[in-house]
C-alpha cells in the first residue's frame, strides 16, 4: 500500500511539473523587434508564446516582456551576444531565455506616495535608473534640506556627443521640474533617444561657486501613450483572474518598477489610478 501511495505522489508531481513546464506567456511589450521563427510573423503585444516556441530578435539588445499564466512577470532576452558570423544565433527558444523578474524589493524601498515633499534627492533618484512618465515631473523638496533660490540651484550634469552639458532645473518656490524638452535640447546637439545616461545631480551655490554631488543615475523618459497601451494589454489578463481594482493597481505598479525602474511615486499612483478606474 505504501509503495502504491508513493507511486501516486510521484505521478502527481510529474503531472504538476509537466503543466508548469507548458505554461504560456502573454507578450505585453517588445523592445526592438521579435519574430515568431515558425510562422515568420512579427510578434506584438497580446500574442501568446509557448515554452517550446522559437523567437528571432532583430538585435542582441532586443527583448520581450511577458506575463505568464500564473501572473509571473518575465523578460525574454538573449544571454550572450552572437558571434558576427553567426546571426542565426539571434533565434532562441522561449523556455531558455524567459527569466522571472526579481526587483519587487525596489518598489518596497522606493514607492512612497504618501510623501508630501522630498527630503533626500539621492534616495528619490537613486543611483541606478530613474524614469519619468511622460515628459515632465514636478518634485516638491523639503526647504530645510534644499533651499532652492536664485543662489542655490539644482543642476544636472551629463554628456552629449562626448561634450559636457550642465542644465539648471527649473523651479517654483521649492518645487523642482525635470523637463524632457529642456534636457534633450543642448548646444552640443539634441538627444534623439528617451534616455540620458550618467546624469550627475549637483547642489550648486552661485555666490561661492561651490557644488556638492548628490547622486548619479540613468534618466529615462517613458512614453505615456505607449505605457497606456501596454497596461491596456495587461488589464484583461488581470480581470480574468477576478482581481479587485486595488489588487490590479498594485500589480501594475509592481510591473512598472520591475521593468522601468524607480519613478515618482505620486506620478505612477495617479497614472494607474486613472487608468484602472476609467477602464471599461
Predicted feature descriptions by range:
Residues 36, 65-67, 205-207:
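Short acidic, glycine-rich loop/turn motifs
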Residues 207-280:
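Short beta-strand elements
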Residues 23-48, 54, 68-138, 142, ...:
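Flexible, surface-exposed loop/linker segments and immediately adjacent secondary-structure boundaries
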Residues 51, 55, 83-88, 175-181, ...:
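Short, surface-exposed linear segments at secondary-structure transitions and domain or protein termini
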Residues 1-29:
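Bacterial Sec-dependent N-terminal signal peptides
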Residues 53, 60-65:
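N-terminal beta-strand/beta-hairpin edge segment
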Residues 120-226:
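Beta-strand-enriched, solvent-exposed domains that form extended recognition/catalytic surfaces
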Residues 10, 14, 51, 118-121, ...:
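Extended hydrophobic/Leu-rich segments
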Amino acid at each position: 500500500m505504501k509503495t502504491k501511495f508513493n507511486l501516486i505522489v510521484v505521478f502527481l508531481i510529474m503531472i504538476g511539473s509537466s503543466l508548469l513546464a507548458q505554461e504560456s506567456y502573454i507578450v505585453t511589450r517588445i523592445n526592438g523587434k521579435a519574430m515568431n521563427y515558425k510562422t515568420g510573423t512579427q510578434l506584438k503585444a497580446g500574442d501568446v508564446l509557448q515554452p517550446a516556441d522559437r523567437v528571432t530578435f532583430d538585435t542582441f539588445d532586443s527583448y520581450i516582456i511577458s506575463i505568464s499564466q500564473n501572473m509571473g512577470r518575465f523578460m525574454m532576452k538573449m544571454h550572450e551576444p552572437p558571434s558576427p558570423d553567426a546571426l542565426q544565433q539571434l533565434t532562441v527558444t522561449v523556455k531558455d531565455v524567459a527569466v522571472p523578474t526579481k526587483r519587487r524589493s525596489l518598489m518596497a524601498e522606493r514607492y512612497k506616495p504618501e510623501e508630501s515633499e522630498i527630503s533626500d534627492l539621492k534616495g528619490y533618484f537613486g543611483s541606478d535608473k530613474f524614469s519619468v512618465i511622460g515628459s515632465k515631473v514636478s518634485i516638491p523638496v523639503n526647504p530645510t534640506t534644499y533651499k532652492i533660490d536664485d543662489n542655490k540651484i539644482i543642476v544636472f550634469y551629463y554628456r552629449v556627443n562626448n561634450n559636457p552639458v550642465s542644465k539648471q532645473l527649473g523651479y517654483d518656490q521649492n518645487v523642482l521640474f525635470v523637463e524632457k524638452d529642456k534636457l534633450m535640447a543642448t548646444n552640443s546637439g539634441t538627444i534623439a533617444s528617451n534616455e540620458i545616461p550618467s546624469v550627475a545631480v549637483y547642489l550648486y551655490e552661485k555666490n561661492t561657486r561651490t557644488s556638492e554631488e548628490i547622486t548619479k543615475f540613468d534618466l529615462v523618459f517613458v512614453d505615456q501613450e505607449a505605457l497606456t497601451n501596454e497596461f491596456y494589454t495587461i488589464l484583461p489578463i488581470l480581470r480574468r483572474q477576478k482581481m479587485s481594482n486595488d489588487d490590479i493597481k498594485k500589480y501594475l505598479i509592481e510591473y512598472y518598477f520591475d521593468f522601468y525602474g524607480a519613478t515618482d511615486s505620486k506620478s505612477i499612483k495617479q497614472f494607474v489610478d486613472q487608468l484602472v478606474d476609467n477602464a471599461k
